[in-house]
Structure formats: structure tokens, C-alpha cells
């Protein structure tokens, strides 16, 4: 591949627990994975590829002009899948930063994809991610909404101390809804996938805790709104309404 410093990888698989086959589900005339691909391309931060173990997904992405890398089917997480894809696409190590964009974010804004790179301007940061302020009690109490607890570093940035499904932190002040978009330094991703699942990762079912427990630094950029992920049939209908206009 041509020399570049940033690569965007979109892991996609058909076997989602709550909505099987979702990458290929139609939203406003295009498969969901193609919407995500288009938004990643619009961010214009580097080459984009879909990492998948499914020929059907690969065929659709290729038919829409996208790049695909085939990966093994037995990866325990999306991070492992993107590391295999990175190793195949860039065996010589030209890529310095890898953005892991979930394949179920069809309404994500290109600005958000660009924003996830900003914390990596600090060389002390290993991994960057995003969050948005929580504004409702329902969101705050929902265990499916992952909260990030962090030390403020200016107005729009946190240094992550913990991620949890609980309602936290306690007391007055903002709470933040974590957005599952990551930018890794290459060495950080390589280290991360070499580590075994950590105790808190297993307890909370949040793989980013593996990095924190290993002493890696995760910084969080604050954005205005949470992009709508598609995990359920109701989410799919919401995305269809949003993208129909």
C-alpha cells in the first residue's frame, strides 16, 4: 500500500447477537456498511478498508468501490480483527495510527472521525476515543450506555481513569457517554492485542479496560452528540428515518 501515517479500518461481521446480518441491511437504498464506508472516506484522514471474515460483506463493499481485507473468523474482538487487517495491509509498518470505526455507525459525522485523532497530538497518549455529555437520567442509568470517568484536560478533553456501565461518577457535575470509536498508535494496538483479557474487562465486558489495567493512557475527546449505533431493530428504523432525508 502507499505510504501513509493513518489508516481507517472498519471491522464488520454478520454474526451480531442482537441483529444478525446487520452490515448488509438496507438503509435509504444502501447497505449499512457502505454508509459507514462513505463517512470514513469523507473524513479524509487516510485510506479506508473494511476488515471482514464474510465473503458476502466483501462482495458488497467491493461492488461499491471500497477496499476489503479478509480476516480470520475466530477473532475474540474487533481489535484483534483490525490488527490482523493492519498486518496484512501494511506489513512494512508505514502506518503509525489506526482508527477503529465500528461498522454499525451509519450516521456518524466525518467530523467525529477526524476528532478522534486530536488527543494523539500528545505523544504521551497511547489510545484516543470520544464521548459526549449525558443529558438525561434515563441515559445515565442505562447499563448499555458506557460511561467514561476521567480527569479534565481543558474544556473538551479527558484523561480516562475508568469506563463503566454503572451510573458514575457520583455527585454533581457532568457524566459522559462513551462513543466506541478509537484511534491507536500502532505500537499501542500491537501491545493491546497481545495482552490477555483483564479482570475488570471481564467483569464490565468492556475491552478498553484491558488497556487501562495495563497502564496504557487513553484520552477522550468531547464531542457534541453520540452517533446512533445500530444494535436492534428499533435502532435500524431510527437510522432509516435519519438517512431518508
Swiss-Prot record:
Any one GO MF annotation of this record: 3-deoxy-manno-octulosonate cytidylyltransferase activity
Entries under Pfam families matching the protein: CTP_transf_3
Pathway involvement of the protein, from the record: Nucleotide-sugar biosynthesis; CMP-3-deoxy-D-manno-octulosonate biosynthesis; CMP-3-deoxy-D-manno-octulosonate from 3-deoxy-D-manno-octulosonate and CTP: step 1/1; Bacterial outer membrane biogenesis; lipopolysaccharide biosynthesis
Cross-referenced CDD domains: CMP-KDO-Synthetase (cd02517)
Family annotation (InterPro entries): Cytidylyl_trans, KdsB, Nucleotide-diphossugar_trans
UniProt keyword Cytoplasm, yes or no: yes
Record-listed E.C. numbers: 2.7.7.38
First-tier enzyme category under EC: transferase
GO CC annotation, single: cytosol
Subcellular location: Cytoplasm
Keyword line: Cytoplasm, Lipopolysaccharide biosynthesis, Nucleotidyltransferase, Transferase
GO biological process annotation, one example: lipopolysaccharide biosynthetic process
Coiled-coil region(s): none
Keyword Transferase part of the UniProt annotation: yes
Domain of life: Bacteria
Reactions catalysed, as given in the entry: 3-deoxy-alpha-D-manno-oct-2-ulosonate + CTP = CMP-3-deoxy-beta-D-manno-octulosonate + diphosphate
UniProt xrefs under HAMAP family: KdsB
NCBIfam families: kdsB (TIGR00466), PRK05450.1-1 (NF003948), PRK05450.1-5 (NF003952)
Task of the protein: Activates KDO (a required 8-carbon sugar) for incorporation into bacterial lipopolysaccharide in Gram-negative bacteria.
Family according to the record: Belongs to the KdsB family.
UniProt-recorded name of the protein: 3-deoxy-manno-octulosonate cytidylyltransferase
Species assigned in the record: Rhodopseudomonas palustris (strain BisB18)
Name of the gene this protein is made from: kdsB
Amino acid at each position: 500500500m502507499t505510504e501513509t501515517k493513518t489508516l481507517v479500518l472498519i471491522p464488520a461481521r454478520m454474526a451480531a447477537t442482537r441483529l444478525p446480518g446487520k452490515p448488509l441491511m438496507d438503509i435509504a437504498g444502501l447497505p449499512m456498511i457502505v454508509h459507514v464506508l462513505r463517512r470514513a472516506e469523507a473524513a479524509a484522514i487516510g485510506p479506508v478498508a473494511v476488515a471482514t471474515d464474510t465473503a458476502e460483506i466483501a462482495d458488497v463493499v467491493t461492488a461499491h468501490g471500497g477496499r476489503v481485507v479478509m480476516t480470520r473468523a475466530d477473532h475474540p474482538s474487533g481489535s484483534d480483527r483490525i490488527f490482523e487487517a493492519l498486518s496484512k495491509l501494511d506489513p512494512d509498518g508505514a502506518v503509525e495510527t489506526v482508527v477503529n470505526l465500528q461498522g454499525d455507525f451509519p450516521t456518524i459525522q466525518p467530523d467525529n472521525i477526524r476528532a478522534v485523532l486530536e488527543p494523539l497530538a500528545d505523544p504521551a497518549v497511547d489510545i484516543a476515543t470520544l464521548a459526549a455529555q449525558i443529558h438525561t437520567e434515563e441515559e445515565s442509568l442505562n447499563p448499555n450506555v458506557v460511561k467514561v470517568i476521567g480527569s479534565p484536560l481543558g474544556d473538551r478533553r479527558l484523561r480516562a481513569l475508568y469506563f463503566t456501565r454503572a451510573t458514575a461518577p457520583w455527585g454533581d457535575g457532568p457524566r459522559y457517554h462513551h462513543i466506541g470509536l478509537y484511534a491507536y498508535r500502532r505500537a499501542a494496538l500491537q501491545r493491546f492485542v497481545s495482552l490477555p483479557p483483564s479482570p475488570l474487562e471481564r467483569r464490565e465486558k468492556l475491552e478498553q479496560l484491558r488497556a487501562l489495567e495495563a497502564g496504557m493512557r487513553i484520552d477522550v475527546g468531547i464531542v457534541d452528540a453520540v452517533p446512533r449505533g445500530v444494535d436492534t431493530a428499533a435502532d435500524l428504523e431510527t437510522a432509516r428515518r435519519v438517512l431518508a432525508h
